[in-house]
Amino acid sequence: TSEELNYIIEHSESKAVLVENKYVFEKIKKHHNDLSLIVFLDNSMHNPDKNIYSFDKFLELGKESLNGKEDFAINKSKKLNNENIATIIYTSGTTGKPKGVVLTHGNILHNVRVLPDIIRLKSGDKLLSILPIWHIYERTISYVTAITGCFTAITNKRDLKIDFTEEKPDIFISVPAIWINIYNTVMKNIDRKGFISKVFAKTLIKGSIRYTRNLRYQNNLIYIIGDETKEEKIKYYQIGIFDYIFHKLAQKIIYKKIIELTGGRLRLTISGGGALPMYIEDFVEAAGINLVVGWGITETAPVVTLRSPYKNYRGTCGTPIPEVTIEIRDKKGKVCKDGVMGVCYIKGPNVFKEYYKDKE
């Protein structure tokens, strides 16, 4: 909101801002005369007399100021260490005014260092990302792809379908809302069909999901809390011959179109930033797309846990990434038993330094 943006400018004592367009520019109208530099990312305004620059002109100024000294950034970086502040990212302010999360180079580099091995990124992989570029989720992923020699394409809801087809990504970085939307679109298209075709398609999907879920139980890839043993679950979830047939038919008739829609090369999709409903996971997995879920927050740069694509336990948000430990404690500070709710304590090199101007 305009109120949040103006608060962030004031609280951070910012002297320069980059704005997407005139709409955002108007939201910070009260600070137009206070700022030393305003850069328009869409190049829609350029007025140096008022300290306003288009992005392209701003880049030209940067090249001129370097004056052939391309090693300027490298020399600067040599003076940095893991404890130096890399960025301050403000939270959404859902529990009050936005808080400035102070992240160090060490915080971010920890995620950058450990994530490629978990998801087994290969040089030359192409990633498609629909994340907001100001979120730490997107920023960390961009750093990860840069150091592994991968290519990242940035998309949005409007262009997602076209970019899937044109970019043909190996990995899709997403949020739950995208997969919910894809699922709803498929179901709406099925509902528009005639009665027999509609019932047939839904029967195939239902049988296919049942087959995929039962296969998970047989392969011991569902986390179980409660009195039932894994042996009891495996015995109960036997794979039926008809479900197998339904699954194969669904692959040819329904899922094939989804695979084509996502470019035909999708090896993995990572979902974060919110809870993903189990029925969506069921559907995406049945369609033949390997989906992993992670959990994290801005204060941890951001990944804390992530499911492995090769040991993808459903019903969880994964195990702690390397060098990170988690404990769930009760109000007295004692570690809770499995399945008992409590407060999550996180320790690791990715945990932020402090809240800006709010160390308490």
Please name every model-derived segment.
Residues 212, 243-360:
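Conserved AMP-binding/adenylate-forming
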Residues 1-2, 7-16, 125-126, 143-153, ...:
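A short helix-loop-beta submotif of the ANL/AMP-binding
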Residues 17, 85, 91-94, 127, ...:
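Conserved S/T- and glycine-rich ATP-binding loop of Class I adenylate-forming
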Residues 1-61:
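Structural core segment of the AMP-binding/adenylate-forming
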Residues 130-135, 273-275:
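Conserved AMP-binding
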Residues 109-126, 133-230, 237-255:
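Conserved AMP-binding/adenylation subdomain of ANL enzymes
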Residues 86-112:
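Conserved AMP-binding A3 loop
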Residues 63-90, 120-126:
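Conserved pre-ATP/AMP-binding loop-to-beta segment of ANL
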